[in-house]
């Protein structure tokens, strides 16, 4: 059975944008459960713990402050990596803007992209305090397994370039393959 959770982004152990530190760092254990409102997938319309859903599986979890075209491109590439994986994996995008406008844009994106392996959700930033997401990080990508962060990528506004997307996607594919 294949699991899906987005974000979330393998063994290089460095952040592409090294000048911003956001989220749990490489080698640290994730702080635990949280329940975003899922906008697609089997739990669409419900608050569901993605951390719990994926357990010890390899996961790419992406946190973003707002929807954007570059974010959609990243999610599309991660969707390809997750669907190509042979084992149980998770991929998820969690946006910390729960506004109606953000929800509508993200739901439209998830539907148009026909996401199958990637869950898109929203949650208020204050409900994510334990994850220590930096305010100046527009996107934070946590690549983890067994609930331990293996790779962390963090990007300020404008830093999620095509080159950065390629690097994150390569790390995700390696992580999913167990390399």
List each language-model region with its residue ranges:
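Thiol/disulfide oxidoreductase modules built on the thioredoxin-like
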Residues: 54-56, 125-165
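Positively charged n-region of N-terminal signal peptides that target proteins for export
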Residues: 1-4
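Short active-site neighborhood of thiol/selenol oxidoreductases, capturing the structured segment around
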Residues: 47-72, 89-92
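Loop/turn elements at helix/coil->beta-strand transitions in domains of secreted/extracellular proteins
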Residues: 55-60, 86-91, 115-118, 138, ...
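Hydrophobic h-region of N-terminal signal peptides that target proteins for export
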Residues: 8-17
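Short, internal strand/loop/helix patches
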Residues: 109-134
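N-terminal "domain-start" segment that seeds a small globular fold
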Residues: 19-48, 69
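Structural microenvironment flanking redox-active thiols in thiol-disulfide oxidoreductases
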Residues: 67-110
């Amino acid at each position: 059975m294949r699991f899906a959770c987005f974000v979330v982004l393998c063994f290089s152990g460095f952040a592409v944008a090294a000048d911003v530190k956001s989220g749990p760092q490489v080698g640290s254990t994730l702080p635990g459960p949280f329940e975003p409102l899922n906008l697609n997938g089997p739990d669409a319309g419900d608050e569901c713990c993605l951390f719990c859903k994926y357990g010890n599986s390899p996961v790419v979890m992406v946190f973003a402050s707002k929807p954007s075209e570059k974010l959609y491109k990243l999610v599309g590439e991660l969707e390809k990596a997750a669907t190509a994986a042979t084992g149980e994996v998770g991929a998820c995008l969690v946006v910390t803007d729960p506004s109606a406008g953000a929800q509508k844009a993200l739901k439209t994106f998830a539907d148009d992209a026909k996401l199958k392996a990637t869950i898109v959700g929203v949650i208020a930033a204050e409900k994510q305090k334990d994850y220590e997401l930096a305010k100046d990080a527009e996107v934070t990508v946590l690549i983890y397994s067994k609930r331990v962060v293996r790779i962390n990528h963090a990007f300020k506004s404008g830093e999620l370039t095509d080159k950065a997307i390629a690097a994150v996607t390569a790390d995700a594919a390696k992580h999913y393959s167990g390399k």
